[in-house]
Amino acid sequence: MTKDIMDAVFIKEMAKTTSNLYRLGWDERNGGNITYLLDEKEVAEYLDVKQIIRTIPMDFDGKKLAGKYFLVTGSGKYFKNVEEAPAVNLGVIQVSEDGKAVHLLWGYTDGGLPTSELPAHFMSHIARLSVDPENRVVMHCHATHLLAMTFTHELTERAFTRTLWQMCTECLVVFPEGVGIIPWLVPGTNEIGEATSEKMKENRLIVWPHHGIYGAGQSMDETFGLIETAEKAAEVYTIVMSQGGIKQAITDEQLKALGERFGVEAKAGYLNN
């Protein structure tokens, strides 16, 4: 006999995280999406993995994820509603063996579908798993100050990263590889997924100019914290600029010392010698 899936840690984590993202104003309306890679063992505690509710075609070759299970936010769903109605707003899916569809095992009880950004998420999972087999979460949101920075700050990865590192001491420690930036592209397309996943091979944070940010990590907390840290730095930058601009900041020598103390290495070429 299976357990009640509402008691599953992964459902509770997703509900708590989506509520926090909405509360912070980073996922207005139906903005934002999360995919959470699950182990078959943890899914089987709550669901009959052979019981397929329906099969949903996918316009993307997901064969590299064949057989894998994911908890996914729904297309057009509001994050503010997840905690009260998980079964409507979330779905547990399994990628088909040919990678051309996903099987719905639970959720989307109103006939809903996985997020329209599923290709970008799946491509990002493939990219991250190739460099970090423990990666489980891909998260997209519209973090306010990071989004604002894409209108006012130079959009080169080195310059953008350096500004974030200089705004909060913890930033270099949390994302020493820096942030990736892609061009503005139409959301929900394979094109934006391909651009994002290419950057995901080296970065866990990818900025979508004038749109939002993608983050990846080994857990829900790690991924949320990664975005949260970068967003805090962007907020500080916004306040600093409104107060008249930067008069002093963390120096490159100090950033190097920080990296040495915490055992991380800044991305090559990002610090001045």
UniProtKB/Swiss-Prot annotation:
Q: Where in the cell is it found?
A: Cytoplasm
Predominantly, its location class is cytoplasm
Any Pfam family hit = Aldolase_II
Kindly report, in one word, the top-level EC class recorded for this enzyme: lyase
Kindly state one GO CC term assigned in the UniProt record.
Answer: cytosol
Q: Which SMART domains match?
A: Aldolase_II
Known EC number(s)? 4.1.2.19
Would the keyword Transmembrane helix turn up in this protein's UniProt record?
Answer: no
The source's domain of life comes to Bacteria
The protein's UniProt keywords, in alphabetical order, are:
Cytoplasm, Lyase, Metal-binding, Rhamnose metabolism, Zinc
- Residue positions binding Zn(2+): 140, 142, 211
Q: Which pathway does this polypeptide act in?
A: Carbohydrate degradation; L-rhamnose degradation; glycerone phosphate from L-rhamnose: step 3/3
Which residues are catalytic?
117
Q: Which GO terms describe its biological process?
A: pentose catabolic process; rhamnose catabolic process
Q: Which cofactor does it need?
A: Zn(2+)
- In Gene Ontology terms, what is one molecular function of this protein? rhamnulose-1-phosphate aldolase activity
Tell me the InterPro entries matching this sequence: Aldolase_class_II_sugar_metab, Aldolase_II/adducin_N, Aldolase_II/adducin_N_sf, Rhamnulose-1-P_Aldolase
Q: Which SUPFAM superfamilies match?
A: AraD/HMP-PK domain-like
What reaction does this catalyse?
L-rhamnulose 1-phosphate = (S)-lactaldehyde + dihydroxyacetone phosphate
Q: How is the cofactor bound?
A: Binds 1 zinc ion per subunit.
Role played: Catalyzes the reversible cleavage of L-rhamnulose-1-phosphate to dihydroxyacetone phosphate (DHAP) and L-lactaldehyde.
Family the entry assigns: Belongs to the aldolase class II family. RhaD subfamily.
Kindly provide the name given to this protein in its UniProt entry: Rhamnulose-1-phosphate aldolase
Q: Which organism is it from?
A: Listeria monocytogenes serovar 1/2a (strain ATCC BAA-679 / EGD-e)
**Gene this chain is encoded by:** rhaD
